[in-house]
């Protein structure tokens, strides 16, 4: 029998200079609400109005992965974020934007979870993004289905987290790591050859998203390699090249190392 001893000792746990530098950068950076993805997604939907909803969603995700600004800190060993700002918050109009519209001006001063907002972003949101999504967002669709009685109840209790996207908590990580985006893309192409007509949109959407995921990974590879060329510290330069190579590797094949697995899952 193994004897377990309870201890409060933190001996052996320490913070490296690299981690300290990353932490200091993150905590010192101002927080902003970003409409970058919202603009990309809105434009993509506008350009593909006749497509099935699942294809619209796939194309909008691919467009965001291909066009949104990316950034890497030299100290990072695992890269990737949904905005260039480390602590930025994303406005996602497809889920719903009523609360954002109501609270934009108070985001910098509210008691909790504050975000700065550029005035021009507020104006763009209200002129370009919000008008397009009125009546089309998930929030709007659910409000139509609930009826007046259910909406009254929702003022007291939480009825469906209609303003939250929960997909991030239920991915099939095992399949993702075993196949990678290229493997899933190949699988979708094979399925398209034999699937029923009503299944085609789904497999086509998988193809589109995996193409976007591969491109996103390669973008990070290219950015880090450019940064490495100007890095004077040889040790850090070699580390950056390794991180870049990980990004390229996982875009082309299943993961082969723990480092690649963590990067791919992130």
Task: Spell out what each predicted region is.
Residues 2-191:
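Long, non-catalytic protein-protein interaction scaffolds
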Residues 178-266:
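Structured, charged N-terminal subsegments at the starts of enzyme catalytic cores
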């Amino acid at each position: 029998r193994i004897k377990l001893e309870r201890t409060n000792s933190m001996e052996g746990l320490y913070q490296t200079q690299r981690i300290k530098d990353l932490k200091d950068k993150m905590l010192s950076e101002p927080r902003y609400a970003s409409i970058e993805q919202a603009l990309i997604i809105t434009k993509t939907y506008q350009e593909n109005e006749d497509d099935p909803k699942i294809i619209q969603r796939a194309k909008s995700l691919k467009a965001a992965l291909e066009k949104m600004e990316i950034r890497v800190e030299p100290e990072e060993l695992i890269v990737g974020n949904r905005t260039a700002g480390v602590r930025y918050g994303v406005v996602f109009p497809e889920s719903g934007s009523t609360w954002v519209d109501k609270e934009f001006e108070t985001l910098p001063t509210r008691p909790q979870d504050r975000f700065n907002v550029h005035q021009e972003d507020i104006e763009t949101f209200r002129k370009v993004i919000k008008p397009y999504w009125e009546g089309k967002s998930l929030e709007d669709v659910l409000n139509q289905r609930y009826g007046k009685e259910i909406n009254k109840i929702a003022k007291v209790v939480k009825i469906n987290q209609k303003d939250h996207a929960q997909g991030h908590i239920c991915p099939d990580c095992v399949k993702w790591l075993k196949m990678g985006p290229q493997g899933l893309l190949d699988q979708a192409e094979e399925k398209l050859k034999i699937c029923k007509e009503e299944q085609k949109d789904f497999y086509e959407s998988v193809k589109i998203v995996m193409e976007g995921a591969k491109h996103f990974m390669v973008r990070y590879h290219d950015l880090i390699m450019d940064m490495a060329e100007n890095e004077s510290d040889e040790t850090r330069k070699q580390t950056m090249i390794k991180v870049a190579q990980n990004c390229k590797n996982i875009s082309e094949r299943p993961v082969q190392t723990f480092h690649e697995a963590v990067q791919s899952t992130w």
